[in-house]
Amino acid sequence: MDTVDGYLAEILAAIRPLAPRRLSLEDADGGVLAEDITAQWPLPPFDNSGMDGYAVRASDTAAATPGAPVTLPVNGEVAAGDTAEHELAPGSCLRIMTGAPLPSGADAVVPVELTDGGTTRVAIGQPVAAGDSVRRAGGDAAPGDVLLAAGIRLGPVPLGLLAAAGRASVLARPRPRVCVFSTGNELAAPGTPIARGRIWESNSFMLASAARQAGADAGRRPSVPDDPDQVLALIEDAAGLADLLVTSGGVSMGGEHDAVKAALQRLGTVRFRKVAMQPGMPQGFGVVGKDSTPILTLPGNPVSAFVSFRLFVRPALRALQGTTDDHQRTARAVLTAPLRSPTGKRSFLRGVLGNDNTEITPLSGQASHQLAALARANALIVVPEQVISMQQGDVAEVISLDD
């Protein structure tokens, strides 16, 4: 029987990162940067106002007090986007908007809140110092500064920075394309009538969502019955359109209707095994299709499929993008109740983190089919293979499901 760590290591050793591509900023969203980005121009590119107010020479406000304000003539206005060259005469001011270029001769901005808001003459009730409310050119980044290092995931802030730096495209590894489907004669599409012995198919929706949350471009196919020919046809079709295939069901140990296993054993490129874990013991990994597309075959019980995704599919997605971040960050929390675990298997029990994530409460529904109980959980409690019980007050390793 394989260990959890050994099986994961086998998967990660076989995954080859996707080739970097030149992507527009829109298409790079969720991708992983494959080049260092340096500033070609100063950020911001020019001195500008950090507030709505009045551009002044700071020395002209030195005598201002609330009881005896300094009054200056307002000789015009500078708006954001104004490309004209404005010059500030001594003893005067210019009304200025946030982001507008600082006029020549000005060295400070008086926020409008510190004035009477005048349009032809303005009373200033307190002095300002040179540099107040001014955003200096290059104050955020100077030319040659590294703005973003290769290997980071491109999300809202990095993409905003790239745009602010004038970049329209970047070299990045794209979001992996993932195809998910489930197998089983018992499965019916949600929203359709079901007879006794049938259930609504849920795993493909859950796993596709989990893949998107993990940074993939994921889609699902309708479930297929326990027919190896149909399963193999779907796998061969999807392999040419995806970077990773994920199946659910059809891999149990000794089952007579294990269509996924029967289909893939014809190819001889996927290895099925038992992994010493609960839930999720039956697993399979290999490659399919002319492009050797990786495939992970997960158990059919919903909780088993979800835990398997967290432990094996999510790290595989990160490996496809060439990231070196932690595949499964863990923390430690105090148990609020005792628990039991089978010997020789690493257990992943559902629990609820509380008290600022310092305590963990095991849930009562721990069976591998209990999806409603999983929906109440926000963490997995990791119980090592050699531990069969833990007591209230013991410190447990936990995996947060909120990240």
Positions of the model-derived regions?
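Short, hydrophobic/aliphatic alpha-helical segments
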Residues: 29-42, 83-95, 142, 285-294
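Structural signal for hydrophobic packing residues in well-ordered secondary-structure cores
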Residues: 12-19, 36, 58, 102, ...
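Helix-rich terminal scaffold detector
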Residues: 1-5, 168-298, 302-308
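Short, glycine/charged-enriched hinge/interface segments at domain edges or termini
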Residues: 2, 54-225, 360, 364, ...
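Flexible glycine/proline-rich
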Residues: 2, 21-26, 34-35, 48, ...
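Intrinsically disordered, low-complexity, positively charged segments
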Residues: 1-69, 154
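Solvent-exposed alpha-helices and their adjacent loops that cap or buttress functional pockets
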Residues: 47-49, 62-67, 85-89, 102-104, ...
